[in-house]
Amino acid sequence: MNISIIWKLSADENSNLITLQCLKEQIIAADLNVQVLIYQKENDEKNRFISELETLKIKADKYALINENSLYEHAQKHVTGDIITYLNGGDRWTPGTLRQVQEISEKYSKNNIFMLRKVMPDGTGGAFAMDEMNKKIVVQDVTKEFYCYPFYFGGTFLSNKVFVENKFDETLGMETEKDFFLRLMAKEKKFIFLNSQIYESVEVQEGNSTFYEGIYKREWYEESFTEFWIPFLKNLKEKYGKVPSFIQYHFMFTVKSRIMSNLNNRNKHVISQGQEKLCLERMGQAFQYIDCLLYTSD
């Protein structure tokens, strides 16, 4: 099996070295053909990363990052692996992850999505579901289990087919990955959860009301609803007759995240005084696509 890894470099050199070491250890431990696509913001040379990876007989290529979301469409044209995944500089996996993904993807060959247990820098999983039975491998059916899963690319492995054939809409800014993965899951309905393999993200994700960078951005409170959630939910209702329940749960989680991020007086929010009502009205417009039983039940 071949694996393609999309690696977006960090501005912090030490973070990149953490990920480089992780990749070297993973690749040495697994008998795999690996392709690494390296993306960077600045036009400086990172030949050290390429040369070190190539000593392991890995195909590594470096590309300039035009904007945060342009790499997805570019990578879709250049990946060669059977399985595709993504890393930010500073991210790392549990030892043996690539070998485990190889084995599981071959065993569950009809599935296209494989997700690791994702944790943030403090070791917590945020609001996202964990398997209470502590099974190593769980087949998750999102039509039956309405949890709020961490639908972002880091820590997720996709088959080449679903990665290449589905569109990343980079005009959605910070919601680009969410749009891609929620639409994909609405079609696929099932994914494989590798509960024993951990992906540690260097970036804090939505749900953390102190360190998630979105709480300081106006677009998280405005464009997120006007440009993404409202038209997204409307489109799903027209397509499926109702918005899939797992997506409704995810929407409720995002609303709660914004409210919880603005319950204090530390002036970290970006909603101007007097604009709170307008922000709530935008959220309210999206609720026309949410089942009332979902937000009135305990």
Q: Each PLM stretch: what is its role?
A:
Residues 12-27:
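Short, well-formed alpha-helical segments that are part of the catalytic scaffolds
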Residues 96-128:
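Conserved donor NDP-sugar-binding/catalytic core segment of glycosyltransferases
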Residues 84:
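Short aromatic/hydrophobic "clamp" motif used to bind/position activated sugar donors
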Residues 117, 191-205:
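Catalytic beta-strand/loop signature of glycosyltransferases that borders the donor
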